[in-house]
């Protein structure tokens, strides 16, 4: 992979008023021209992280995720981790909130502030050497729904509970 194509995007980062939308557009366009056309990018406005954690704390006090529903989520691992470790945060929220449209609307408004710019190619490349279709991409991956208990020596189902995000959102 090429990483960040600075020759094509640096001008959008280095100006006094960065143009993150154009950065995302050029980043994705760069990868779409490659022989390996796989990429995702999310620009995160960190001043909204605590607000999102507070909203998710309210949600997690009311709703409990059933890992049997993980198949409904956008997998961002492909075949690398089994069971999946990383899912799309937006996919998770949409499924978790279910029919609570008021809460989901609040989430969407906050998410638009937290991730004002995002982009993805039609597929992503996985560490296992396979590709995964991207049907939904919010700009953030999340491991909260993961039931992975030990692949590669990491018990994600337990380790995720030791993160600052988990403490702030549960």
Enumerate the predicted regions with their spans.
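Terminal, contiguous helix-loop blocks that mediate binding/assembly
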Residues: 1-170
